[in-house]
């Protein structure tokens, strides 16, 4: 796989609280320069990213219910609508992990369905936070996402105790079939990214995108 091909797997990511406007501008410039698929940013920076990415092919991805996923469903749906109105091309929502742990699967499904409906055709990725789930819970969550028809299931927020693993990516891919799988959290080098892709990932979320496509080591990135 060429570096240009690998770049098209990457959502170039900046989600930590201290990221400022200059950081987001730099992120957008890097995404254009290296041909990344998208930038993944908090929704307050969508207007800035829209301005910086004008005329390019780089998409704007934003997060909803991030990073805990425990917001009211109505709030998630409203956040989704407002983000799309502002210019988001893709939505990454966080599933309600507490409801999964409470076996409230109907509520889990309704939560995702509400955001999916709010997307109104905009691609939706559902973040499972796999490090907090059992294998059975991962499978059940993936089955719900497949039934609803979301665009992707995603491993992690990158804000918890663990990120993507090859094992979890393979399990998710085997469960969802043709739906996309996004590996995120802890993917910081070429070898790891390629292992995730081999396991079934069709998108990589990373703040170390430049290191991933260039084959260098990134010791600074946190996502």
Curated annotation (Swiss-Prot):
It catalyses: 2-deoxy-D-ribose 5-phosphate = D-glyceraldehyde 3-phosphate + acetaldehyde. It comes from the Bacteria. The keyword Lyase applies. The active site is at residues 92, 154, 182. Pathway: Carbohydrate degradation; 2-deoxy-D-ribose 1-phosphate degradation; D-glyceraldehyde 3-phosphate and acetaldehyde from 2-deoxy-alpha-D-ribose 1-phosphate: step 2/2. GO terms for cellular component: cytoplasm. One of its GO terms (molecular function) is deoxyribose-phosphate aldolase activity. Pfam families: DeoC. SMART domains: DeoC. Its EC number is 4.1.2.4. Gene3D superfamilies: Aldolase class I (3.20.20.70). Catalyzes a reversible aldol reaction between acetaldehyde and D-glyceraldehyde 3-phosphate to generate 2-deoxy-D-ribose 5-phosphate. This is Deoxyribose-phosphate aldolase.
